[in-house]
Every structure is written in C-alpha cells, then in structure tokens.
C-alpha cells in the first residue's frame, strides 16, 4: 500500500495548484466579438462578464433585433473562448502527479 502521508502531500499540492489556477482563470480575459467587432463582450475565463461594448453607430431603434443577435453572438464567442482557456489551465492541473490518465 502506498504511503498515506505521501498521498496527503500530493493532495495538498493538487489543492494549491487548483487555487492558483482558479486565480489565473479569474485574471485571464477573453473577448468575444460579433458584426466585425461592433459588439464586444469581455469576460474572464471563469465566465464572468466584465464589459459589454457596443459601437454607437449600430444603435438604431428600428433594428433592435439585429443588435440583440449581435450581442448573443458575441456572448457565445466569448463563452467559447473562456471555456477553451479554462480547459487549457485545468489540463495542467495534474501535471507531475501520479493520477490515472484522463482524470483531468
């Protein structure tokens, strides 16, 4: 049987690494855009929206539905990028630890 103290040390390392990754995810910003950049959504890799920017030139009360579509598209783009960054950071979580393959 493996030394339980060694396993506890490895668990502590994993927890420390996880805390560091969580902090990095909070600081990592991604930008989703739509309509050639007229709508931008900035969020962190924890999927928390930080900013929404809309070019005033596209604000037209007769075309609100187009603006709504652009906002939704920019949000989807930002979410995709945030999830990619998160997966990238989480993939490094188990580096150097003797864990079963595919666990993270």
From Swiss-Prot:
Cross-referenced InterPro entries: YbaB-like_sf (IPR036894), YbaB/EbfC (IPR004401)
Compartment(s) of residence: Cytoplasm, Nucleoid
GO molecular-function terms, A-Z: DNA binding
Keywords: Cytoplasm, DNA-binding
UniProt cross-references to Gene3D superfamilies, sorted A to Z: Nucleoid-associated protein YbaB-like domain (3.30.1310.10)
UniProt function note: Binds to DNA and alters its conformation. May be involved in regulation of gene expression, nucleoid organization and DNA protection.
Name of the featured protein: Nucleoid-associated protein DICTH_1981
Source organism per UniProt: Dictyoglomus thermophilum (strain ATCC 35947 / DSM 3960 / H-6-12)
